[in-house]
Amino acid sequence: NNHNVAFYSLSIGLEEYFETYHQVCVYLSEYERDDKEKINYKAEKNGIGYIKSYLNIAIHIQHFFELETKRLLEKEHVLFAVDDKGDPIILNKLLKNISLNSEDTKNLKSVEFSEAIDRLKKLVENGILTDEVAILFVSNYKLLKALNNLRNTIIHRGKRIMKYCEL
């Protein structure tokens, strides 16, 4: 069930977020905890622990929002969450509410997160989707786009490790 997987990803991402505190702030004296330069220095010095947590945060939090966005789209209609350039036979079955066999399901391609959040935004803005969670996601559209960009920058280019105080 994608809903459960989404919340497992959220749980992992949040655990790692709180782990960054352990990786950095536990080693700071009380007077250093307000000094951003010292905090960022400790994060860099601890290196691997902070970076591991940081990567898990970006990957798993983005994964949660991607799965939940697609779930919201699918709840309205499965076609909102799939690539419309797919197999026309499968699309025909979906349009006519004909059950898909396992081979059809295997060949169904879901949209990328960036496209999914764009679709969700249009559906909410046009009153087609009125779900409170969908509205909340759309009200944070720029943040979700930035999160997706951050995750893609990390995964595909291995760049953009945020300083601890930016996180």
Model regions and ranges:
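Intrinsic-disorder-associated interaction segments
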Residues: 3, 62, 106-109, 113, ...
